Amino acid sequence: MLEEDSKASDRLSQAVAGAPIEPGRSPSLGQTVLPPEQTIDLAHLARMACGEKSLEAEVLSLFDRQAGMLLARMQQSSPKVAGDFAHTIAGSARGIGAWKVAAAAEGLELAARDCDPARFARAHRRLASTIAEAQAAIRALLAVR
């Protein structure tokens, strides 16, 4: 069990650092990693919403708004507060299966603790990029529902 925890910790560290992770596994929760072109894990989303399409649409819409709002607030916040916002985004992203957003948010959380402005700025740009990707995917998904 301890060895499995160590491997999971290593995968999380690799993902946060932007390094490749073990194929077929997510960096933090052991879920399957999707091909790069797939931004939202639709199977995970369906499981979380118990197959309710209206609930899936609702949580996707909520994530879209929340992530955009928190990202905007980060720009006027201290690194500590931005890290707290990133923590919220990471949890929400995991809920809808937006694994790249979750990993980027975890990276920003860690960068916020480092007192390294350059690393923090890179992590913020990465998070903004992955959120924009997820928002585009969400809008496309909602348009066909």
Spans of model-derived segments:
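Long, amphipathic alpha-helical coiled-coil segments characteristic
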Residues: 38-88, 95, 119-142
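Eukaryotic all-alpha helical interaction scaffolds
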Residues: 93, 111-112
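C-terminal compact regulatory domains
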Residues: 1-31
